[in-house]
């Protein structure tokens, strides 16, 4: 089982999902079957059972989405592992869940459910791996993802980050005001002007973060009232020098005027170079962009397994 950090350490991440998420699952099914289901017609409505097999190693994440796909199709899912468990390590094709229902409904939901589960699990696996690497390097603070998510699939990807023990970062543009270089340039290059406008419009409840290219810009942003400063595309040594200087000036811990985030090109190969006590947040899109999926397969059990030989080996076409 993956070590519990972040949201999973305090409760069930599924309880964070908004009421609209079930509608999103329904839209996935509509996208996949906008008209006649010819394959479903062939197999009919007879009762059937299918096994969900984990064919590669990883952290299981996305259980609510998988379950909801089949719930909307009048099927039931019984899990033999828990969300957050590591699967596929000791057993190549580990039986992780059983799905029961009308055979055409099993096949109707198969690809949609597998896509969500595989993607979400891949992100949770990568998040857990990167977090473990940072903990081994002595980093004790927050690892976060980014907003560089797949349009229409953000909820699943952010959920995977949570299950993997990471902070999902801001959910959307309304969750926090992040002033990037383009925002500053659009305000005649003035960080104080941009921060003042953000504070005036968003009010006290919304934090303001400023992307900074230098220690000087970070000082200006904090002085202007930024709640978070992002040191963007710094070198590892540059981050350590700048973050210490900023903390020395603006305070640490509960006395800090602002949090310090580090981002820009961080991945498993270099993130350990950035570890120091004065960084509050390390964020990386490598947690969720270009991440290898965890490979799952759903295999329907033949009505008479003995007559048809053993159940399929779990290999299937990608379509």
Segments predicted by a language model, with ranges:
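Active-site T/S-Asp motif of two-component receiver
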Residues: 231
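Glycine/alanine-rich phosphate-binding loops at beta-alpha junctions
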Residues: 234
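Glycine-centered loop/turn positions within well-structured domains
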Residues: 237
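Short, charged, intrinsically disordered terminal tails
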Residues: 243, 286-319
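Short acidic, glycine/proline-enriched helix-loop-strand junctions
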Residues: 249-258, 303-311
């Amino acid at each position: 089982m993956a070590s519990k950090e972040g949201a999973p350490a305090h409760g069930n991440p599924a309880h964070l999902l908004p009421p609209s998420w079930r509608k999103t699952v329904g839209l996935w099914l509509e996208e996949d079957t906008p008209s006649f289901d010819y394959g479903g017609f062939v197999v009919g409505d007879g009762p059937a059972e299918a096994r969900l097999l984990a064919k590669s190693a990883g952290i299981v994440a996305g259980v609510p989405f998988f379950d909801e796909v089949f719930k909307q199709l009048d099927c039931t899912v019984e899990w033999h592992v828990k969300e957050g468990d590591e699967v596929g390590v000791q057993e190549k094709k580990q039986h992780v869940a059983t799905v029961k229902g009308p055979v055409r409904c099993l096949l109707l939901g198969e690809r949609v459910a597998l896509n969500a589960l595989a993607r979400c699990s891949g992100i949770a696996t990568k998040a857990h791996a990167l977090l473990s690497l940072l903990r081994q390097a002595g980093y004790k603070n927050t690892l976060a993802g980014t907003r560089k998510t797949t349009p229409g699939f953000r909820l699943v990807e952010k959920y995977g980050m949570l299950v993997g023990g990471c902070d999902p970062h801001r959910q959307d543009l309304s969750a926090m005001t992040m002033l990037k270089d383009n925002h500053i340039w659009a305000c005649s290059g003035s960080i104080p002007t941009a921060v003042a406008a953000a504070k005036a419009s968003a009010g006290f409840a919304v934090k303001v973060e400023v992307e900074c290219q230098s220690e000087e810009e970070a000082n200006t942003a904090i002085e202007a009232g930024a709640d978070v400063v992002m040191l963007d595309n710094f070198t590892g040594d540059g981050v350590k020098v700048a973050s210490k200087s900023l903390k020395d000036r603006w305070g640490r811990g509960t006395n800090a005027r602002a949090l310090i985030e580090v981002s820009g090109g961080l991945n498993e190969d270099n993130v350990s170079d950035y570890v120091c006590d004065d960084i509050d947040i390390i964020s990386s899109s490598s947690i969720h962009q270009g991440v290898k999926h965890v490979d799952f397969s759903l295999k329907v059990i033949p009505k008479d397994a003995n007559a048809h030989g053993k159940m399929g080996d779990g290999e299937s076409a990608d379509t």
